[in-house]
Regions:
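Thiamine diphosphate
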Residues: 115-123, 133-142, 152-161, 168-180
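Feature marks extracellular polysaccharide-active and adherence modules
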Residues: 33, 54-56, 63-64, 73-75, ...
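C-terminal binding/interaction regions
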Residues: 184
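Long, low-complexity, mixed-charge
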Residues: 1-61, 136-138, 149, 155-157, ...
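The right-handed parallel beta-helix/beta-solenoid scaffold, focusing on the short coil/turn
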Residues: 28-30, 39-41, 47-49, 59-61, ...
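Conserved small/polar residues in nucleotide/adenosyl-binding loops
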Residues: 188-194
Length: 200
């Protein structure tokens, strides 16, 4: 395991080291200490590595992610997993505004709540929020799935295209092109044994 102290070594050195990892790297597990809400942590990754961030982050954590798994053991600032292409981003705490914005693929799991505009303009990403989401979530969502185990505030799905939204709790006022329907058939039931991150 590669251990990196962000306070001592700096953000530029961290992202440079992560970007240098080839697809065949043996340095597959990274632990980042003392993030102290730094911005742009682990952005633009493109290798099958696992990055564990031990604390909360600022803006744009794990943006433009490809292949990598980024696990934040804390909360995240605005724009987490923005324009994500593939891989997995897991947030143990809460997420600020526009988490998963414009995401094209991959999976974003938020175990707390997500603020406003979660999944705005999503284009294929799958987002699971264990808590609730703020106003205007999935605005102009074009493809992908938003699963909310809590409540959704006003403006959910405004100008929705072909994305699918599931809400276990209550919803506020729905906007244009978003229609409420009863769930009549669940095609896929995740197994807690094989998908533990969804149930932890």
């Amino acid at each position: 395991m590669q251990t990196f102290d962000l306070e001592a070594q700096g953000l530029r050195a961290l992202n440079t080291a992560l970007h240098a990892q080839p697809g065949s790297t043996n340095q597959t597990i990274w632990e980042i200490l003392n993030p102290k809400r730094a911005h742009a942590l682990a952005v633009g990754l493109d290798a099958p590595i696992e990055v564990n961030i031990k604390g909360s982050t600022g803006y744009y954590c794990a943006g433009m992610n490809k292949q990598a798994t980024v696990h934040v053991h804390g909360s995240v600032g605005p724009g987490t997993a923005e324009n994500m292409m593939s891989g997995t981003v897991i947030v143990e705490g809460d997420a600020s505004q526009y988490a998963g914005a414009t995401g094209n693929g991959g999976t974003l799991i938020i175990k707390g709540n997500a603020s406003s505009r979660c999944g705005i303009s999503m284009k294929g990403i799958d987002i699971v929020v264990k808590g609730s989401v703020g106003h205007n979530s999935a605005f102009m969502a074009q493809a992908g799935h938003l699963v909310v185990r809590g409540d959704a505030e006003d403006g959910l799905g405004d100008s929705l295209y072909e994305a699918v939204i599931y809400v276990a709790g209550r919803t506020g006022k729905l906007r244009a092109d978003c229609q409420a329907q009863e769930l009549t058939c669940l095609l896929y039931t995740p197994d807690p044994a094989t998908s533990p991150t969804l149930f932890a």
